[in-house]
Amino acid sequence: MTISKIVKRINEELAGELLTYGELETFLDQVIDDINHQLDSKFPAFSDFSAETYPDRYPDYNFFPEEYIRNVVIKGAAYKFYVMDEEGIPTAQMFQYNYQDQLFLMLRDYLEYVPEEFKKDGYSAVRLYDVAWKEPWVKYDGI
């Protein structure tokens, strides 16, 4: 999805705000940071995404499926905006629940499909299928 479409959809989520990409970039970066933390990945932040750094992709931010752009990035940026906006604090809680649900679904459904180039080195979770237990109740004697 192009940056202009992302900005348009965020403004629609924000009940017709007219924020520019420059005003939303911080919130978009925060969402990408959350995604990277959840998926143990290194997708580029929007502030690092330019024609110079990604000439083959710019202006289409397509590092993961568009479904997650719509359901996680756009909703997450709207939530991050409402948290910072004094008038939006009552609305922020509804956006928070929706954003957290969608972030969890992204973790559940997309974790194994993160492209190799965007995976961090190492794992942040225990990978139980790498352990050679014969029976779950039998003590494992080493690796």
Q: In which residue ranges do the predicted regions lie?
A:
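Elongated alpha-helical scaffolds
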Residues: 67-76, 80-81
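Broad hydrophobic/π-residue packing in well-ordered secondary structure
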Residues: 34, 53, 57, 76, ...
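Short helix-capping/linker segments at secondary-structure and domain boundaries
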Residues: 81-91
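Short secondary-structure subsegments characteristic of cysteine-rich extracellular domains
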Residues: 92-108
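Conserved short "hinge" loops at termini or chain/domain junctions
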Residues: 1-62, 89, 108-143
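Short, amphipathic alpha-helical segments
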Residues: 67, 71, 90-93, 97
